[in-house]
Amino acid sequence: MHYWADLKNDPLQGWDIWTLLYLHQRQVDKSDWDANKAALGYGTYAQRPGNSGDASSTDGNDNLLLGLSWLTQRDQRPTFALWGIRTSAAAQAQVAAYGFAEQPAFFYANNRTNEYSTVKLLDMSQGSPAWPFP
């Protein structure tokens, strides 16, 4: 939520990412697969993810990685790795095929729930940064 608000430079749009991820998943589930798979960010997938017996079947983690990377136009693999979120080789290859700039691993620290004005972005690619609040 804070990431999307920062990306859009508008704290009021922060929660919109959840709606966009939901809509993206519905399009993946309901679209004419062959006609729309590339436009939805699944160009390397021969079949719709989740088809029974499909070797490239995805789970929720894969869908989140693909959807978030596609919507933000950033390679989100470092952040997923930071959080220990496992994704398949097929999803990793699809994100690599996008050719997007890598989003460094990050964490939004906050000492108040959902209070955007107090959020501090921590770059997690440099090890363990100090907690920014007293």
What are the roles of these predicted feature ranges?
Residues 10-17, 75-76:
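Loop/turn elements at helix/coil->beta-strand transitions in domains of secreted/extracellular proteins
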Residues 37-134:
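Beta/coil-rich, acidic/histidine-enriched accessory regions frequently appended to metallopeptidases
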Residues 19-36:
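Long, well-ordered core segments of solenoidal/helical folds
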Residues 1-9, 18:
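Catalytic cores of extracellular degradative/oxidative enzymes
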